[in-house]
Structures are given as C-alpha cells and as structure tokens.
Curated annotation (Swiss-Prot):
SUPFAM superfamilies: Alkaline phosphatase-like (SSF53649), DeoB insert domain-like (SSF143856). Coiled coil: none annotated. The keyword Glycosyltransferase does not apply. It is found in: Cytoplasm. One of its GO terms (cellular component) is cytosol. This is Phosphopentomutase. Keywords: Cytoplasm, Isomerase, Manganese, Metal-binding. Binds 2 manganese ions. It catalyses: 2-deoxy-alpha-D-ribose 1-phosphate = 2-deoxy-D-ribose 5-phosphate; alpha-D-ribose 1-phosphate = D-ribose 5-phosphate. Mn(2+) 2 binds at D286, H291, H339. One of its GO terms (biological process) is nucleotide metabolic process. PANTHER family: PHOSPHOPENTOMUTASE. GO terms for molecular function: magnesium ion binding; manganese ion binding; phosphopentomutase activity.
Amino acid sequence: MAAVRRVVLIVIDSVGIGAMPDAADWGDAGANTLGNMARQRGGLPLPNLGRLGLGNLCAIEGTPPVDAPAGAYGRMAIFSHGKDTMTGHWEMVGIRPEAPFRTYPDGFPEDLIAEFCRRAGLEGVLGNKVASGTEIIKELGEEHLRTGWPIVYTSADSVFQVAAHEERFGLERLYEVCRIARDLLRPPHRVGRVIARPFVGTDRTNFTRTANRHDYALEPPRMLLDEVKDAGLSVLAVGKISDIFSGHGITYSVHTKSNADGIEKIHECLDRQEPGLIFANLVDFDMLYGHRRDVEGYARAMLEFDAALPAIMAKLGPEDVLVVTADHGNDPTYIGTDHTREYVPVLLYGEPIKPGVDVGTRASLADLGATVADLLGVPQTGFGESFADQIRK
C-alpha cells in the first residue's frame, strides 16, 4: 500500500470519554468529560464529530451513535502513570514511560527554591504551593507588584509554574527565570514542565493572565516526530506542541492564542501543502474550561470545534488523513480542578481510511503513534501497536 501523504493530527486537549478502570485510584471514579457535560446541560449536539463515530464511543446526550460512521473510530487508554499533557502527548508519539514525572503536593523543597533564587538572581518567591493559576494571582498578585518576587506554584501535574506581571516584572525576564528553572529541574527532580504564566492588571479585581504563556519541557528521547523529520517530511506544530517536545523533530512551529486561532493556523498549515505531519493542540477546552469547571464554556468550545470541522475536512487531499484525539480528561462537572483519568477518543477520516471500522479499545496512546508512523511510511519507535492495517483501504 502507498504511504499517506499527510496526517493532520488534532489534539482536543482534555476531551475524555469515560473513566478508565483505575480512575478510582486517582480520585476520578465516574469521570466522563463529554458524557457528564452533555447530561448536565441537557444535551451536546456534535453532528460532525458524531458522523465520524464519536457517539459510538460513549453515551453523549445529543450526539447519538450512528449506523455507518464516516471514519474509523475507537478509544485509547493511557498506559503511563499519569493524566497530564506531557504524559499523554509523549505516550502518543511512542515514548515509552520510565519513572513517572514527579509531583510536589506540598510545594517544592526549600533548598530547591533557594537554589532557583540564587541562579535567577531573585531575593525570593511567593506562594510555593499547589494552587489554581487564576486564584493565586488574585491572592498574591498585589504582593508580587510590591516586592517584585515572582509567584511559584504547582498542581496535581508535574509542573513548576511561575506567574509574574508581564509589564512590571517583564516578559523576557519571566522567560529567563523559567529557563533557569528548567535547567535546575532535571532528573532526579524530573519535573515535566516549567510554565511561564504572565498576567496584567493593577490589582486583584482585574488581574488577567495573557496569551504569552510559554512551556519548557524536559528533553524527550527519540520519538515519532524525529522519525518523520528524518524521513525528509515536514512536521508542522500548532499551539503548544513545540513546547511539549522542546522543539525536537519539528520543522515549523506556530503558537496560538485561542482555539479559534489554532484552527486558523491549522488551515494555514494545510495550505502549505507540505507532505508529512500537521500536529496541533487546541488547549482552551482544558485551560479555560476544564480546570475552571465551566460546563457551558467547555460545551461552547466543543460546539465551535465541531462547526469548524467541515472546513478542515474539505481541505484534505486524496492522500490525506485527519485524526482527532485527546491527551487525557478534564471533566468540568467533577469535584476539584484537576485532570481526570479517562479514556480518550480516536477518530480517523480521509480517502485512504475505511469508513465504519471500530478499532476497539487500544491499550495505549502509543498505538496511535505507531499507526501514524505506518501511514506515513516511517519507522515506528517500538512502543505501541499499529492498527493501520485495520483502517487503510
């Protein structure tokens, strides 16, 4: 069989479809991002995703199963020990999990913070605890403006987040201290991501995070993107993809300010007509709505993405394949503010794909990476079981 010319892989960040068997171990029993959201609001009609088979994967009020899905469809488990962006995306490109990324539920050790301050030339930091990003700038933003000390916080994920005022502290200075933190937080600390979280405003009533977030990830081992690039193909990264992989295996990268901007950038990448992989992350579902438990905001974002799908599909050539998937769950109806341990959907569509094929429940997100490798005719990483033969015409 001839190789596919292009794969357009869109990660709709945090769109889970039901609790995994071990969800209770993570405090996530009964989580179902799409199912619970649809039920709570009395329906969530996603006709275009439904036509691809989304409603066949879990009960979504308003998006029923269809008898003849237009694409191949299935669900994937997260094999790795985690439920965060890094874990999901790294597994998806065939990176076999080693030790889990470390989390710091009690904040970071004092000696580590002291070394960070020494290297970064800081008198001190504020916070150093688990917190919501929007709440901690309300709590500590005014003190940050008085002292000039950045706000350090973490979450249930393996993240070292640094919030600072974009104008008073300075965006480039914020990026500089985050690069210093990234260098410090390598193994044995093994923090997955250092995240710069700039904000603006004058007091706690109007502090607002800006779109100039920047992620600094651990350096990944060899993975799918390297294989695609080394085969002479393009890897066009949209959104935070380049940050997640520290730029490895990427030939072109563009950051985005919103889902709508991300969809526009996907169109621009499609218009480039370069053979290879377009790899996009649309983060608003997770960042703006999942963590904030905003059911209506999340639902609106899903409706907008569903409405945008036909125009993307219309730009697919006869040798192109569209893949829609997610990296973890983040049920906006659930208690707390953290990600949820869920299965994620995988929907594949295009002229090379057999319609109506149920690929079942995959043991790992790496199965998708192995499948993309086979479709593009590049070597697999050795982690993940390809289902390309099931779905290719």
